[in-house]
Amino acid sequence: RGQQLVSALTPGITVPADASLLGKAVGNLLSNASRYSPEGAEIRVWCGRLEGRPALSVENTGARISGDALPHLFEAFYREEGSRNRSTGGSGLGLYLVKMILDRHGAVCTIENTEEGVKATVRF
């Protein structure tokens, strides 16, 4: 799809976690960023500290989410109306599972529109 992954990772950031589960959560965020971005879009991954605590973010460019949909994104089977098409697929369970995994790790994920796209931020 010609998308570019750009990362800014702070060395030495660790969290006590089930690496497999946490990998699934982060993988889902990355997959969504790619799936809902156009060809040639930039996907940005950041890892560092926010307010002294470990955090990471995944941000896409070129795609946004309606304000009405934002509060519902982590609900099971929820899909924003515009995302229901054959090219994106999905069951509406991905972000729900992300939330369940992060809850288990004492982490919180927020999703917001930015000037360029959508950013998911995970705070541990």
Regions found by a protein language model. Give the residues of each.
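Conserved catalytic submotifs in the C-terminal HATPase_c
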Residues: 4-13, 50
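A residue-level detector for a conserved hydrophobic packing site
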Residues: 22-23
